Amino acid sequence: MTDGHDVVNPEGLPHPSGFNHAVVSAGGRTVWLAGQTALDHHGVLVGGGDVVVQFDQALRNLLTVLGAAGGHPEHLVSMTVYIVDLDDYRAHAGEIGQVWRRLVGTDYPAMAAIGVARLWDADALVEVQGIAVLPA
């Protein structure tokens, strides 16, 4: 990238096309994490119509990218969750919260949940995107 920004595209995730999984700013330690869906490392969507399984995989993917950039879950400062079916997501909020606590703990960044008509992958139910600030 220009201006010395570093891109992060870790092994274990599908090779990105038209985006990077993360960008680390050259002037600081801010990491912008690209949206992640429930794709496995072969680029196959997992979880079928199960929003909890898809959230679990999408969050795991985001945390994989964050780790490859040198960060940890507690470095997340903002996260946006894009959801195809808000009613289904809310109906499973308790289970989704359990996934969060298992993978991240009880640190919560600033968050927004946004309902969308569909995601890039037509079968994806949820996508997570984040920003992290790493210690200097």
Question: Where are each of the predicted segments found?
Answer:
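N-terminal presequence-like segments and the immediate start of the first folded domain
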Residues: 1-60, 64-77, 83-136
